[in-house]
Amino acid sequence: SRGLGDVYKRQVADRSPEHYESREKEYAQCIERLGSVEVPAKMLAIIVEALERKPEQDFLGDMYMQLNLGNHWKGQFFTPYCVCKMMSEITCKDIDSHIEKQGYLSICDPACGAGATLIAAANTMKKCKHNFQNHVVFVAQDIDRITGMMCYIQLSLLGCAGYVCIANTITNPLTGHVLFPNEKEGQELWYMPMFQNQIWTWRRLFQSMGGLGGTATTEKTVEKEHFYMFFDLDKKEEAYENR
């Protein structure tokens, strides 16, 4: 059931020829195996509701460990979210100058699991009034495809921009520019939908042209956007403008 939602979201975010056909085939196989799209749709709705009610959590990671699904041979002992939150609050400081200079920064977790560290970083950025959707590239990598997909689902639903790489970080690490990762043999890249928005598209364009692609360029080209929403079931929707 996990695969159906993953494949659909990737097809929306990544329609490159080298990925599209294989993803369409996997999508069809998931539907055939499950018998219908209703089960994964209900599961996705549960995840969405959980993250809407409480963004400050690693919902899938906690469930994964509570069900004793972790593989100790792969070192799957997920860091508790409270620890990830503490680390993000310690490290996510003095970032204004970096964003002002380049327009964005990248945050990488080479052993992402279900994405707790990156989720905590996104929430810390939001707490500090930084629009992480437009100014942070989230890069995740994990050797385990299932946990990597859990990370992809949660970061995508939280509106993060970036990608997840399924591969061994030690023997097959990501290479290339952070905006243009090289997908090597043995790697599987999953691009988050938000990474295809107008601002990141302009940044990749300017980077490919040799420009800086920083704040001044992209924000003059792309007006402040109001359609990136954070949801809270107990409050009205809040729109966060670019900073």
Regions found by a protein language model. Give the residues of each.
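Short, small-residue-biased leader/transition segments that mark boundaries at the very start
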Residues: 3-8
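S-adenosylmethionine
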Residues: 154-243
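Long amphipathic alpha-helical segments that form oligomerization/scaffold cores
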Residues: 15-18
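Conserved Class I S-adenosyl-L-methionine-dependent methyltransferase catalytic core
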Residues: 21-90
